Amino acid sequence: MSYTVTLRETDKKKVYVDPGIREGIYLYPGEIKKLKLLEGSMLEEDEFERIRLQYALPRAKHRAIAILAKRDKTEKELRDKLQQSLIDTKTLEETISYVRTCGYVDDLQYARDYIYFKKGRKSFLQIKMELQKKGISSQVLETVFEEEGGQEMEDILMQIK
């Protein structure tokens, strides 16, 4: 299948390559020049996918790792941050899958760490609400709070003895 390329400038740095039928990708002007993409030119689906895999996907992975290098994030927080970077849906999903597979994003571990650092200063209800806002699923919360509830009971028993 062939697409007619539409180039739309989004800001000073990126140009949106819109194939018309499916979601487009963002490329830098230098990349568009290198690829010799012109307004109205025809682009085959496999060529569009090759460009996405060669340019958009590595850039998205690099961006995700840069975001996570500064501070741990939940999957939802990372997804929201990447969407602000004008990353197309398919590339976004592949990037999230990549960082999850590599262990860079782990909502269960994030919730455990968050509870560990906050439990002395905040109630479990406050912590639970904050984690829900951060996009932690109810299933993960249930698992973590079951673990933590058992630990809390052990701590209380140790203090009594």
Residues of each region from the PLM?
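An alpha-helical, amphipathic repeat domain used for nucleic-acid recognition
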Residues: 1-161
